[in-house]
């Protein structure tokens, strides 16, 4: 199987390469791509020796001279095109909104998209829905649902449940959240992830996103997709069937498990990393989501019901609001407040092309920045 890894230096991209290392005899690594020509990308090129290494930032002369023999450097879109053309499966592990266009190019080329980038699933929703047979979700929750849904008839499923750990603020009061720091928000209790998705996990916006993703990936009505707090993060997806039975997918909190499933589907491979026993996957408890404290889920659901331009605006607004919080410009609760206000001011038409989708995302970013300058800048 010929594999391309887009966003190779991030968390999921790096773990994909760890999986590849254990299956070199079955996988040909066509190329790795990252935004920056960083030391990490160079070390990956040396260790894994792909055919192509690609960055959007111009590398230094010394960096290029350090590439191992047989590894070809390509810049930007030229490199992306080469990797897509020569790969069969492409892991889209690019972080944030920058993963949207590459996902579209993979689908347009008729290749299999291993979808880890949330924003691309959301913004390309209808395109994803029409090409579902060539999209394998990598996110642990959607990968779990992908597996569960293959074992039942669609008409037998009453509800789909996504599980949320609750993040670092599950037991904090609304009053305490007013003064929550960036450092506290980045301490996820279960998963080791990048900064953006960790903050989305703290606000529970990631679960709002995941509801909409499940809607597009599996063609389920939004109202039939539920979120439940599961602090242990052992259960990744649940189906409630019409006979009142529940099917659950359970595994340790290790992204290499869904990565392996997506790489080798429909086959399964022996897991080559540290395993846990069933007894270690306990206890398992579930709790109701406090939507008065975590407004992001209902806000995302509303954007999903509105559809059209509202979803890419939501994505762009979230990107900018999280960035403002990470840079300590706003408070934790301001993240969702800014997004909500941006959505309330939408006055642009529904996008008809990928270019217009990207413009709507950028509109959401700029609108949040504008509201911030209007209401928050200069405070304190």
From Swiss-Prot:
Q: Which domain of life is it from?
A: Bacteria
Q: What positions belong to coiled-coil segments? A: none
Pathway noted in the entry = Isoprenoid biosynthesis; isopentenyl diphosphate biosynthesis via DXP pathway; isopentenyl diphosphate from 1-deoxy-D-xylulose 5-phosphate: step 1/6
Single Gene Ontology BP term?
A: isopentenyl diphosphate biosynthetic process, methylerythritol 4-phosphate pathway involved in terpenoid biosynthetic process
User: Where Mn(2+) is bound, by residue?
Assistant: 139, 141, 210
* Keyword set includes Manganese: yes
Q: Which UniProt keywords apply?
A: Isoprene biosynthesis, Manganese, Metal-binding, NADP, Oxidoreductase
Q: Does the keyword Oxidoreductase apply?
A: yes
Which co-factor is required?
Mg(2+); Mn(2+)
One GO molecular function term of this record is: manganese ion binding
Q: Which family does it belong to?
A: Belongs to the DXR family.
PANTHER family in alphabetical order: 1-DEOXY-D-XYLULOSE 5-PHOSPHATE REDUCTOISOMERASE, 1-DEOXY-D-XYLULOSE 5-PHOSPHATE REDUCTOISOMERASE, CHLOROPLASTIC
Provide the function of this protein.
Catalyzes the NADPH-dependent rearrangement and reduction of 1-deoxy-D-xylulose-5-phosphate (DXP) to 2-C-methyl-D-erythritol 4-phosphate (MEP).
Kindly provide the name given to this protein in its UniProt entry: 1-deoxy-D-xylulose 5-phosphate reductoisomerase
Question: What is this protein's gene name?
Answer: dxr
């Amino acid at each position: 199987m010929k594999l391309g890894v887009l966003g190779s230096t991030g968390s999921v991209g790096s773990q994909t390469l760890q999986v590849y290392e254990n299956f070199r005899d079955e996988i040909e690594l066509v190329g790795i791509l990252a935004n920056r020509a960083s030391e990490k990308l160079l070390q990956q090129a040396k260790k894994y020796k792909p055919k192509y290494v690609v960055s959007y930032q111009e590398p230094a002369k010394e960096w290029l001279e350090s590439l191992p023999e047989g590894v070809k450097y390509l810049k930007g879109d030229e490199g992306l095109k080469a990797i897509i053309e020569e790969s069969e499966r492409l892991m889209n592990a690019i972080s944030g909104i920058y993963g949207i266009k590459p996902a579209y190019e993979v689908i347009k080329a008729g290749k299999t998209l291993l979808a880890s980038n949330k924003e691309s699933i959301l913004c390309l929703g209808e395109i994803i829905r029409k090409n579902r047979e060539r999209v394998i979700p990598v996110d642990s929750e959607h990968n779990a649902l992908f597996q569960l849904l293959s074992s039942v008839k669609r008409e037998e499923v009453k509800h789909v449940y996504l599980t949320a750990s609750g993040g670092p603020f599950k037991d904090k009061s609304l009053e305490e959240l007013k003064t929550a720091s960036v450092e506290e928000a980045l301490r996820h209790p279960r998963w080791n992830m990048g900064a953006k998705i960790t903050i989305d996990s703290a606000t529970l916006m990631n679960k709002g996103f995941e509801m909409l993703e499940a809607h597009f990936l599996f063609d389920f009505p939004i109202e039939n997709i539920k979120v439940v707090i599961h602090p242990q993060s052992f259960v990744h997806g649940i189906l409630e069937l019409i006979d009142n039975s529940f099917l659950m997918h359970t595994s340790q909190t290790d992204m290499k498990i869904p990565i392996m499933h997506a790489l080798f589907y429909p086959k399964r491979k022996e897991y080559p990393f540290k395993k846990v026993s069933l007894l270690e996957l306990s206890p398992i408890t579930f709790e109701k989501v406090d939507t008065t404290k975590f407004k992001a889920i209902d806000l995302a659901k509303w954007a999903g019901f509105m559809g059209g331009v509202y979803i890419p605006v939501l994505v762009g607004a979230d990107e900018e609001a999280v960035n403002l919080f990470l840079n300590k410009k706003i408070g934790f609760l301001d993240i969702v407040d800014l997004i909500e206000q941006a959505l309330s001011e939408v006055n642009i038409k529904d996008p008809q092309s990928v270019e217009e989708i990207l413009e709507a995302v950028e509109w959401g970013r700029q609108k949040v920045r504008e509201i911030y300058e209007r209401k928050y800048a200069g405070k304190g």
